[in-house]
Amino acid sequence: MAVISKKIPAPDKVEIKTALLSVFDKTGIVELAQALSEQGVRLLSTGGTYKAIAAAGLAVTDVSEITGFPEIMDGRVKTLHPTVHGGLLAIRDDSEHQEAMKTHGIEAIDLAVINLYPFEDVRAAGGDYPTTVENIDIGGPAMIRASAKNHAYVTILTDPNDYAEFTEQLSADGGKTAYAFRQRMAAKAYARTAAYDAVISNWFAEALSIDTPRHRVIGGALKEEMRYGENPHQKAAFYVTGEKRPGVSTAALLQGKQLSYNNINDTDAAYELVAEFLPEKEPACAIIKHANPCGVATGSSLVEAYRRALACDSVSAFGGIIALNRTLDAETAEEIVKLFTEVIIAPDVTEEAKAIIARKPNLRLLSAGGLPDPRAAGLTAKTVSGGLLVQSRDNGMVEDLELKVVTKRAPTAQELDDMKFAFKIGKHVKSNAVVYAKDGQTAGIGAGQMSRVDSARIAALKAEEAAKALGLAVPMTHGSAVASEAFLPFADGLLSMIAAGATAVIQPGGSMRDQEVIDAADEHGIAMVFTGMRHFRH
């Protein structure tokens, strides 16, 4: 049976007479304490916060003086006391609560300013197990939750960004806060503790290799509110989880306006793809539109990689996202600004390149500070009606697979390189995906079709259009390798690929009709390998 409320009406304005300040992040805390002192508010504090306030010459009382109990166990126990929690939780207009406060010498606390041990930062920095556990805050969340529950009477501040609004209200209302403000701060407080606990629970699951915990909570901190979502009638916001994986959520915006919902989604897809190519081995460029690649290439230089990626489908690249695996240089920047582009993301940007990009002030330029590790473990999540689908990140790499030649003809060394290149790209194309590649360059990409044959045909059509635009006698699919991200269920898909000019095929295998497909390949002298790994993407 649920706990029954006494339904005592909450007052609109509550005067702040006593405040408890206990923070790890001391940004603005002395200034806040000064403002409270000027309003005649009694200050209570703990540990380092107490020292900072006292050092500023402000009158402050250590919490241990009102509890009559010292801080013990290396600070693990300092505010977990009835005097503190009674002062936060007491319903001021309840006679029974008032009597209990008098009986036990409990004073009301009207304001709590609390923030937490930096568990997220310690986890992100890869702290060892004991250090990470030690940075799990106990007293802080308890006080936050107690204060937020009793927001009818208590104001809770958990974010230094709210101090200015609070002090303005305090000055304007004669040292009082409004109920609407207290409600809003309470909602924010519970969101903060929920996100904090989510990070802790997910860290434990990761540390203990628990793949399917009984409860899975994914938390995030608001990074920005957006003008709209995927479409103008949808509301949207961008939340960051605290994971330090280089990419769109951690990158610095060097120029350009705020990224849109679609910009963020597409930029993430682009950067995750280009990270498949080691920068120390070769420069690479990926051009993305609607989260699908329209051109990917490597080259002897970054500018050559860009030109080759653009050549695959220069029409679709218009208004796209460009991702690079090396520092953006001036020569590449000069080429990029010739085309209307939404976003460029790279590990770094030279000063010369910045000056060139600045000629296009609406072009968003992101410096990610590094590349994400495509082999790193992690989670992805997708919402469905009433649920959340959570899975491990697709970190399978074709270089790590044992490829099985299943045809009479084995691929040449060049065909094998092209196969691996195409399969890398196919991993990042919406299913059904077919990718033709030749000499480290996509020749044609077919994405998102219900029929794999249609994806193969679209990819071939794109190659034909590119050949016309470039003045080539034949499409680049002639003599190419082709990748399918999932098995070929029938020989018709293979025959379509052969008709486009492919000489080698890479696919996961695993169809009931694998032998039928193999026989068709042998009949046409095609080399085919199985990877044993599928890369569906939806």
Swiss-Prot record:
Domain MGS-like: 8-158
PROSITE patterns: MGS
Catalytic reaction(s) noted: (6R)-10-formyltetrahydrofolate + 5-amino-1-(5-phospho-beta-D-ribosyl)imidazole-4-carboxamide = 5-formamido-1-(5-phospho-D-ribosyl)imidazole-4-carboxamide + (6S)-5,6,7,8-tetrahydrofolate; IMP + H2O = 5-formamido-1-(5-phospho-D-ribosyl)imidazole-4-carboxamide
UniProt free text on domains: The IMP cyclohydrolase activity resides in the N-terminal region.
One of the GO BP terms on file: 'de novo' IMP biosynthetic process
Enzyme Commission no: 2.1.2.3, 3.5.4.10
Signal peptide coordinates: none
Classification lineage: Bacteria, Pseudomonadati, Pseudomonadota, Alphaproteobacteria, Hyphomicrobiales
Pathway: Purine metabolism; IMP biosynthesis via de novo pathway; 5-formamido-1-(5-phospho-D-ribosyl)imidazole-4-carboxamide from 5-amino-1-(5-phospho-D-ribosyl)imidazole-4-carboxamide (10-formyl THF route): step 1/1; Purine metabolism; IMP biosynthesis via de novo pathway; IMP from 5-formamido-1-(5-phospho-D-ribosyl)imidazole-4-carboxamide: step 1/1
NCBIfam families: PRK00881.1 (NF002049), purH (TIGR00355)
Highest rank taxon of the organism: Bacteria
UniProt family annotation: Belongs to the PurH family.
One GO CC term on file: cytosol
UniProt xrefs under InterPro entries: AICAR_Tfase_dup_dom_sf, Cytidine_deaminase-like, MGS-like_dom, MGS-like_dom_sf, PurH-like
Molecular function in Gene Ontology: IMP cyclohydrolase activity; phosphoribosylaminoimidazolecarboxamide formyltransferase activity
Keywords for the protein's UniProt record, in alphabetical order: Hydrolase, Multifunctional enzyme, Purine biosynthesis, Transferase
Name of the protein in question: Bifunctional purine biosynthesis protein PurH
